[in-house]
């Protein structure tokens, strides 16, 4: 019987799974829409929803709890400044999962997980300026 089994293991050890959700949640907060496999999207949804709920509550302790789960300072700032205000009226249900067909290489079922009422301009944002050594730039 499957009583008390709360999460999928996704064929990963616990540390790998934790890192996967940290990276995917940071990407979802940054781009507000990502494409992944359906089981990963279904497992990511409660992880991100809890982060947004922490951000809505605000406060230093909730910010530290979110930082422990997210590990990305810039996305934490976006989470607490932008997303908390955007979803202040909404009681849960901050994400949407849309099935997106099958991957050609291995026929894995794909899904798009996105934030509800998302910012269309956030999709495809780059990671910021690339670090360039000024000495090499001055010689050119």
From Swiss-Prot:
Gene3D superfamilies: Ribosomal protein L17. SUPFAM superfamilies: Prokaryotic ribosomal protein L17 (SSF64263). GO terms for cellular component: cytosolic large ribosomal subunit. Transmembrane segments: none annotated. Signal peptide: none annotated. The keyword Ribonucleoprotein applies. The keyword Cytoplasm does not apply. Residues 120-140 are annotated as: Disordered. GO terms for molecular function: structural constituent of ribosome. InterPro entries: Ribosomal_bL17 (IPR000456), Ribosomal_bL17_CS (IPR047859), Ribosomal_bL17_sf (IPR036373). Keywords: Ribonucleoprotein, Ribosomal protein. Belongs to the bacterial ribosomal protein bL17 family. PANTHER family: LARGE RIBOSOMAL SUBUNIT PROTEIN BL17M, RIBOSOMAL PROTEIN L17. This is Large ribosomal subunit protein bL17. The lineage of its organism: Bacteria, Pseudomonadati, Pseudomonadota, Alphaproteobacteria, Sphingomonadales.
